[in-house]
């Protein structure tokens, strides 16, 4: 669902058909992205099996939204069976020009407070941004028709409500979408391939589908296995501000609506909101999550008490699990950045607060000079220091002595666990082994550590950002976007 790159639509739903909205992105020479083989270097990121949450059904189909000749799915539905008390939560783009779908989704979550919000319908390769009243009518029609089809075809009385996330410039092929809903419903299931095909169905310029799942336990139920699964997408227009891509996450753990929203918002801040490809925050993006409690239907749900000094052990444990899980999904997005050849970790240590450290890391992650240097296999620390030097200008952190040249060190950490290479030590450039530098920069994974307080005390907060290099291919993809 990114405005220039994603062409994906997302739709949350609950009890009765609500409203919907979608996305558009017009491809020409890159229309072939949809059916190209997964690059050999990326195949290791695509799981061949998984463990998926109980009570969730996933389906996908091709309704002809993608350019003629492409066979991959372009319409996706993820929903919890109605027998389970399900709640939903979402984090939405903070771009000041949000798509109507974002506004509708925000309204739905606000009105329902997450109760009864059971799933998402999404389409790729066509958006609905900047299409006026006709586009809004298409969205509402899509929502209504999808709900009617699910109601008629369900043995469990499904009657969903929809809202969606989208992109703009051209109206949806609404008739094709409506005609595809019965087939979409027939294709729903719980197997690994259902999830994998759904992950394929939200891809646009992605080179591989992004899917992850895992099991976990909670302190109060150590013998009960819970599951969490998620699909995500995004290859360009990626920079955090409360959702930077489309993400759909489901768990069969019992969680109250208020707790789910709190858990998702906190986890997004330390995962999806810590990635950047080219520094552009999309108008359409959303990460949404659903919990149905199907793995422990009689157990008291995880709750959130805003007045409590601390939360329950289950809440704390699940928060940690969710942050790790969402970080793994978010890193898959970066690994598939448009044209990217390097996966870069920016680690800032010694910051007085986490927000300050995160802000510094985000500025370095957006430095075109630094990112192009990594692409050219030149680890020149000047790009890092330049970005660090201006990172706090005109911010709430300016003038507070956070950056001290005489205490600042910059090093590159080899992916193989070898000793790190110190390029700057307490403000001074260091001589380095050029052979080791060459070996380091040949690796796909590059980690840069910026220590703001290299005084041996170990004091301060640590913040991490993930980004990628800027390549010739990135320029080609975006320069030829509509040609």
UniProtKB/Swiss-Prot annotation:
Substrate binds at residues 204, 233, 244, 338, 478. The record marks 166 as: Involved in the stabilization of negative charge on the oxyanion by the formation of the oxyanion hole. Pathway: Amino-acid biosynthesis; L-arginine biosynthesis; L-ornithine and N-acetyl-L-glutamate from L-glutamate and N(2)-acetyl-L-ornithine (cyclic): step 1/1; Amino-acid biosynthesis; L-arginine biosynthesis; N(2)-acetyl-L-ornithine from L-glutamate: step 1/4. Keywords: Acyltransferase, Amino-acid biosynthesis, Arginine biosynthesis, Autocatalytic cleavage, Mitochondrion, Multifunctional enzyme, Transferase, Transit peptide. The keyword Amino-acid biosynthesis applies. It holds the Pfam family ArgJ. Its EC number is 2.3.1.35, 2.3.1.1. GO terms for biological process: L-arginine biosynthetic process; ornithine biosynthetic process. GO terms for cellular component: mitochondrial matrix. It catalyses: N(2)-acetyl-L-ornithine + L-glutamate = N-acetyl-L-glutamate + L-ornithine; L-glutamate + acetyl-CoA = N-acetyl-L-glutamate + CoA + H(+). The alpha and beta chains are autoproteolytically processed from a single precursor protein within the mitochondrion. One of its GO terms (molecular function) is L-glutamate N-acetyltransferase activity. NCBIfam families: ArgJ. This protein may be expected to contain an N-terminal transit peptide but none has been predicted. Belongs to the ArgJ family. This is Arginine biosynthesis bifunctional protein ArgJ 2, mitochondrial.
